[in-house]
UniProtKB/Swiss-Prot annotation:
Monomer. Interacts with complement C3b; this interaction is dependent on the presence of Mg(2+). This is Complement factor B. GO terms for cellular component: extracellular region. Its EC number is 3.4.21.47. It is an enzyme of class 3 (hydrolase). Cleaved by CFD following activation of the alternative complement system, generating Ba and Bb chains. Cleavage and activation takes place when CFB is already associated with complement C3b. The keyword Protease applies. Mg(2+) binds at residues 278, 280, 353.
Length: 764
């Protein structure tokens, strides 16, 4: 850096149904029920409780590894007493207690043995399976009892291949009736008293050797799906649906392709989001679910996917906010706007729970007038995301509408072509009050897929959302981040690189940079001198402590910090950009990902622009002639933070650039364009807002435009007029002429394109 100036070293869609199971929590010590039920004597030994539904119900809460016995929830009855504590065999218990979670034992295991045998298994206990001679083991040979009361792995099955269909197995905890696996033979499953069956109770051997329905399991009330389980199961199922759509267009998507498919806007896939807004949900949970859906739609769109959306909320009556037939129903921005305008109070006056009516609204969007099906109706796949606690209290059984929808779409009528792939109904429930029987009845049941989910709380559902959208096949997409509450600095800024140059007897230089490909980091040229050796340059990414080996530093050929000394300009920062080439290829992950560069195919997709978009059109989108909201990343007290600034690219541009004369060494420059060339972008000042300024260690870092949930680098931080961090701390009060200047990447594109030509960035 210069000595006088202050250069600043600085699918496929993934859809999620989000809904609370009617939980409005209140610490028991702070509130009493609004009803007449006393809190005296309701305590649980070894745990605590919290009130739900404004005190009309309560939930017992136990430490991890324990469950509430004999029940998880109690309701306040009209008699003024809490519901009785009864065991699964209807015996009355005087006081609730927390008991250790056990995993169920296998009731039966066909054609093999398991060990050890026990009436129950504690958390972390293991069980092993092996088959008799002549039988082959499918599934997991070893399984571990998990903290949620479920076994790890897959159902162990011993099969000799003699049946037309393979042995469907006996999931641990279930009982199976039927041992013949010929074509059209059926088996049925049952659970012990007090447990709820999830999945298919009856499965039939179908033509082709597959079983109808989905594998069953027996659920206790305290059991929840973990975020990881939900993310993996839902993503796997939905990806199958997307790949089916793509295959009909003659494509065979690879792992990378299937997340870049732009579906036919005429309706290759319709997605119906159905949100329960009834009284049992509560305003805060409704708002939280709505916010998550907004983020979800944004994320789906950020992958370049364009399904048509239908959007329904309901209580006593449904309200259709978006129809799949609306001209803009595949426009994520428009759909998001409609969702943002929905209020929980829209259903306040009639707040029953009529799930049947809501599904009838979906049916009306699927159906066609005059019973004349439109062209291509039989190629459109339909995905319903139903967000409900399953506690419908009016309107009748909603499963009848699912049957009508199946009939409309001609599903299950022809055994040779059952068309099951053309309808997927996913049901999500959150919290302890979910009716597991009802939500299981509504969900689709497909072999090797899961369509019904129950998670513990909204926080867990948020985890599901982030785990699903951030799976490994999207890691190479530029400008993506993991904006999760548990995310580290580098989850939220995965492109950020820290650069240090060690100079013997001269100390060290600190800079920032941005990962732009698997081999390159983009930074400022002034961070280095001609005497710096590669071994003295340290680069770290992803918050890792190890330094990356450097192969070479590539400077822009027109950069020359001493280029105008004879003209009385001590330091000249035009073309202040450099690329650091790494010796070894970066391994992308959640904390190491590339930022988007202008005029690349990746940025076209990120901005959701047509494939024919030109570089000039990208520039107009990212850098219009006005004040442009942008950000940079700074390190304060060893923590990365985003700083919001405005690029002055409109009527304030001239005054911003003129303030460069206040920089040390530039006070005698008569023509400011001698130092502020067309290659610079200007931020800082107090209008339209007081912008934060960069510090010395920020130099070389990216100036970023955040648009449509993606981050696009438009500049490289170069130099500033005022050193606002003289005493290792950013000053709060700075003069209005405190400006920062950044190299405009649109102005150095030929050089970037030349040096990054082998990085598969798809420059336009």
């Amino acid at each position: 850096m210069g000595s006088n100036l202050s250069p600043q070293l600085c699918l496929m869609p993934f859809i999620l149904g989000l809904l609370s199971g009617g939980v409005t929590t209140t610490p028991w010590s702070l509130a009493r029920p609004q009803g007449s039920c006393s809190l005296e004597g309701v305590e649980i030994k070894g745990g605590s409780f919290r009130l739900l539904q404004e005190g009309q119900a309560l939930e017992y809460v136990c430490p991890s590894g324990f469950y509430p016995y004999p029940v998880q929830t109690r309701t306040c009855r009209s008699t003024g007493s809490w519901s009785t504590l009864k065991t699964q065999d209807q015996k009355t218990v005087r006081k609730a207690e927390c008991r250790a979670i056990h995993c169920p034992r296998p009731h039966d295991f066909e054609n093999g043995e398991y060990w050890p045998r026990s009436p129950y298994y504690n958390v972390s206990d293991e069980i092993s399976f092996h088959c008799y001679d002549g039988y082959t083991l499918r599934g997991s040979a070893n399984r571990t009892c998990q903290v949620n009361g479920r076994w790890s792995g897959q159902t162990a099955i011993c099969d000799n291949g003699a049946g037309y269909c393979s042995n469907p197995g006996i999931p641990i905890g279930t009982r199976k009736v039927g041992s013949q696996y010929r074509l059209e033979d059926s088996v049925t499953y049952h659970c012990s008293r007090g447990l709820t069956l999830r999945g298919s109770q009856r499965r039939t051997c179908q033509e082709g050797g597959s079983w109808s329905g989905t594998e069953p399991s027996c659920q206790d009330s305290f059991m929840y799906d973990t975020p990881q389980e939900v993310a993996e199961a839902f993503l796997s199922s939905l990806t199958e649906t997307i790949e089916g759509v793509d295959a009909e267009d003659g494509h065979g998507p690879g792992e990378q392709q299937k997340r870049k498919i732009v579906l036919d806007p005429s309706g290759s896939m319709n997605i119906y989001l159905v949100l329960d807004g009834s009284d049992s949900i509560g305003a805060s949970n409704f708002t939280g679910a709505k916010k998550c859906l907004v983020n979800l739609i944004e994320k789906v769109a950020s992958y370049g996917v364009k399904p048509r959306y239908g959007l329904v909320t309901y209580a006593t009556y449904p309200k259709i906010w978006v129809k799949v037939s609306d001209p803009d129903s595949s426009n994520a921005d428009w759909v998001t706007k409609q969702l943002n305008e929905i209020n929980y109070e829209d259903h306040k006056l009639k707040s029953g729970t009529n799930t049947k009516k809501a599904l009838q609204a979906v049916y009306s969007m699927m159906s066609w007038p005059d019973d004349v099906p439109p062209e291509g109706w039989n190629r459109t796949r339909h995905v319903i995301i139903l967000m409900t606690d399953g506690l419908h209290n009016m309107g009748g059984d909603p499963i009848t509408v699912i049957d009508e929808i199946r009939d409309l779409l001609y599903i299950g009528k022809d055994h040779k072509n059952p068309r099951e792939d053309y309808l997927d109904v996913y049901v999500f429930g959150v919290g302890p009050l979910v009716n597991q029987v009802n939500i299981n009845a509504l969900a689709s049941k497909k072999d090797n897929e899961q369509h019904v989910f129950k998670v513990k709380d909204m926080e867990n559902l948020e985890d599901v959302f982030y785990q699903m959208i951030d799976e490994s096949q999207s890691l190479s997409l530029c400008g993506m981040v993991w904006e999760h509450r548990k995310g580290t600095d580098y989850h939220k800024q995965p492109w950020q690189a820290k650069i240090s140059v060690i100079r013997p007897s001269k100390g060290h230089e600190s800079c920032m940079g941005a990962v732009v490909s698997e081999y390159f980091v983009l930074t400022a040229a002034h961070c280095f001198t001609v005497d710096d050796k590669e071994h003295s340059i340290k680069v770290s990414v992803g918050g890792e402590k190890r330094d990356l080996e450097i192969e070479v530093v590539l400077f822009h050929p027109n950069y020359n910090i001493n280029g105008k000394k004879e003209a009385g300009i001590p330091e000249f920062y035009d073309y202040d950009v450099a690329l650091i080439k790494l010796k070894n290829k970066l391994k992308y992950g959640q904390t190491i990902r590339p930022i988007c560069l202008p005029c690349t195919e990746g940025t076209t997709r990120a901005l959701r622009l047509p494939p024919t978009t030109t570089c000039q059109q990208q520039k107009e989108e990212l850098l219009p002639a006005q004040d442009i909201k942008a950000l940079f990343v700074s390190e304060e007290e060893k923590k990365l933070t985003r700083k919001e600034v405005y690029i002055k690219n409109g009527d304030k541009k001239g005054s911003c650039e003129r303030d460069a004369q206040y920089a040390p060494g530039y006070d005698k420059v008569k023509d400011i364009s001698e130092v502020v060339t067309p290659r610079f972008l200007c931020t800082g000042g107090v209008s339209p807002y007081a912008d934060p300024n960069t510090c010395r260690g920020d130099s070389g870092g990216p100036l970023i435009v955040h648009k449509r949930s993606r981050f696009i680098q438009v500049g490289v931080i170069s130099w500033g007029v005022v050193d606002v961090c003289k005493n290792q701390k950013r000053q709060k009060q700075v003069p209005a002429h405190a400006r920062d200047f950044h190299i405009n990447l649109f102005q150095v594109l030929p050089w970037l394109k030349e040096k990054l030509q082998d990085e598969d960035l798809g420059f336009l």
